[in-house]
C-alpha cells in the first residue's frame, strides 16, 4: 500500500511539473517513470509472497532502488551544504550562468538569477557582471536576452560583459574565464605607465588575484563550484539565487543526474 501511495504521489507531482516546466522537455516526464517503478516494486512483493519469483530477485531490485534513493539524499545534502550564508562583497567579477531566458514565466530560474545579480550590483557597484550563455533550444542567445533585461532594469551596459559561445555549465565557466582574462589584459594595457629613466629603480608589484563570484540558482551552486575548482578557479565564491518552491524537488532530482554525469565525464 505504501509503495502504491508513493506511485500515486509521483504521478501527481509529475503532472504538476509538466504543466509548470513544459510539455516538450523529456526530462519532465521522469516522475511518471518513478510512479511506474513504485507500482512495479509493489507488484514484485506480491509476486514473491505468491511464490512466483525467488527472494534474491526481490532483494536485488530493492537494493538497487535503495542505492538510488541514497545517492539522491547524499547529493541533496551536499547541495544544501554548499549554499553560502552571505554573499562575498566587493568581487571583481560576477559570472551569471546562463539558462533558458523565460523571463515572463512564473518561477523563472533565469529571472531569479538576474534579479539576484541586480541586488548584488546595487550593493557592489564596482563589480563587473559577466553574462554567460550561447544559443538555446529556442534559438535565442541566452546571454544577450539576459543582458538586455539587466540594462532595462538600470544596470550600466558598460558594466556588463557578454559571453555567447557556451552551451553548458562547464563551457559557461571556461569561456567566461577567457573573457575575464582578455578584459583584464585590455584594461592593464590601457593603464600601463611609461617609466622615465631618471626616476630611479622601480619595483614591479604582482597583480592582485581576481576575485570572481559564480551566480546561479541554489540547486545548481554545488556543481558549478565543483566545475570551477576543477578548471583552476582560485579566488571564487558562490552567489546563490533562489528557485521556485514547487519545482525544487524536481530540480534536485535533475541536478542529481547532472552531477553524476559530470562526475563520470571527469568534469568534477
Where are these regions (language model features)?
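Lipid-exposed faces of alpha-helical membrane segments in multi-pass integral membrane proteins
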Residues: 6-12, 64-70, 74, 253, ...
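Transmembrane helix-loop junctions in multipass membrane proteins, especially transporters and channels
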Residues: 22, 80-84, 266-267
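Membrane-embedded alpha-helical segments of integral membrane proteins
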Residues: 1-47
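A structural signal for short, hydrophobic/glycine-enriched beta-strand patches
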Residues: 73-254
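Transmembrane alpha-helices and immediately adjacent membrane-cytoplasm interface residues
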Residues: 41-85
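Structural motif marking the loop-to-transmembrane transition
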Residues: 1-2, 29, 53, 57, ...
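A transmembrane-helix-recognition feature enriched in membrane-embedded lipid enzymes
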Residues: 252-268
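Basic, gly/Ser/Thr/Pro-rich low-complexity segments located predominantly at protein N termini
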Residues: 12, 19, 103, 138-139, ...
Amino acid at each position: 500500500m505504501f509503495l502504491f501511495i508513493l506511485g500515486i504521489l509521483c504521478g501527481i507531482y509529475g503532472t504538476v511539473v509538466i504543466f509548470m516546466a513544459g510539455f516538450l522537455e523529456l526530462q519532465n516526464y521522469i516522475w511518471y517513470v518513478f510512479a511506474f517503478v513504485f507500482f512495479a516494486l509493489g507488484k514484485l512483493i506480491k509476486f514473491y509472497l505468491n511464490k512466483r519469483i525467488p527472494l534474491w530477485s526481490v532483494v536485488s531490485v530493492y537494493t538497487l532502488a535503495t542505492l538510488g534513493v541514497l545517492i539522491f539524499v547524499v547529493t541533496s545534502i551536499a547541495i544544501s551544504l554548499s549554499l553560502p550564508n552571505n554573499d562575498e562583497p566587493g568581487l571583481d567579477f560576477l559570472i551569471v550562468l546562463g539558462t533558458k531566458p523565460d523571463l515572463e514565466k512564473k518561477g523563472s530560474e533565469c529571472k531569479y538569477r538576474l534579479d539576484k545579480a541586480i541586488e548584488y550590483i546595487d550593493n557592489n557597484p564596482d563589480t563587473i557582471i559577466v553574462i554567460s550563455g550561447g544559443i538555446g533550444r529556442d534559438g535565442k542567445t541566452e546571454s544577450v536576452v539576459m543582458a538586455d533585461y539587466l540594462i532595462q532594469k538600470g544596470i550600466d551596459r558598460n558594466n556588463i560583459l557578454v559571453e555567447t559561445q557556451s552551451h553548458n555549465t562547464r563551457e559557461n565557466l571556461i569561456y567566461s574565464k577567457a573573457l575575464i582574462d582578455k578584459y583584464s589584459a585590455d584594461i592593464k594595457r590601457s593603464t600601463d605607465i611609461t617609466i622615465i629613466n631618471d626616476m630611479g629603480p622601480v619595483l614591479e608589484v604582482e597583480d592582485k588575484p581576481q576575485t570572481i563570484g559564480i551566480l546561479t540558482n541554489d540547486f545548481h551552486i554545488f556543481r558549478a563550484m565543483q566545475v570551477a575548482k576543477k578548471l583552476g578557479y582560485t579566488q571564487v565564491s558562490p552567489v546563490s539565487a533562489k528557485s521556485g518552491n514547487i519545482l525544487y524537488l524536481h530540480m534536485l532530482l535533475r541536478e542529481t543526474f547532472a552531477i553524476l554525469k559530470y562526475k563520470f565525464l571527469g568534469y568534477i
